[in-house]
Amino acid sequence: MSIVTTEHPNAALVRRGYVAFNTADLETLSELCHEDACWHTPGRSALAGSYQGREAVFGHFGQYGGLTAGTFRANLQAVLTNEDGTVVGIHQNTAERDGRTLDVRCCVVFDIRDGQLVDGREYFFDLHAWDEFWA
């Protein structure tokens, strides 16, 4: 007897999003993100805040790569889903900047509606380390 499992479409969307993010594939990210999407990054660093609209969100993402000379990565470890459109992605953020190394686990709660990301909220396992890296 074999067990067949099917991945929820929202989980597949999030997996595609991580690949697109890590390869700076703006075409795919544009397809996956609603034009009015919101992104929320906690903390006290200059990157903390809420970003409204696809262009603002992408500008925020661009800072991650730009401030780290392209070394920033979000290495996906797990994806959890439920039927209401919510997906949780757990990943390890890594980067190098000004002689410092970032290695912080994070989860993002994604709200997916009609096949597009409408809201993303980051939660860091060590918010202090995250903020210190960007200081």
Where are these regions (language model features)?
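Short, low-complexity N-terminal intrinsically disordered segments enriched in polar/charged residues
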Residues: M1-E35, A135
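A solvent-exposed, acidic/Ser-Thr-rich amphipathic alpha-helical stretch
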Residues: T28, H34-E83
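Beta-strand elements of well-folded, non-transmembrane domains
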Residues: N22, A95-R97, I112-D114
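Hydrophobic/aromatic beta-strand elements that line small-molecule binding cavities or substrate pockets
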Residues: A74-L80, Q92-T94, R105-F110
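Short, solvent-exposed coil/turn segments at beta-strand boundaries
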Residues: L29-L32, N82-G85, F110-L117
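Short beta-strand segments that buttress and anchor functional surface loops
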Residues: G62-Q63, G89-R97
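A short, polar/proline- and glycine-enriched secondary-structure boundary/capping micro-motif
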Residues: S50, G99-T101, H128-W134
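Short beta-strand edge/turn micro-motifs at domain boundaries
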Residues: V108-D131
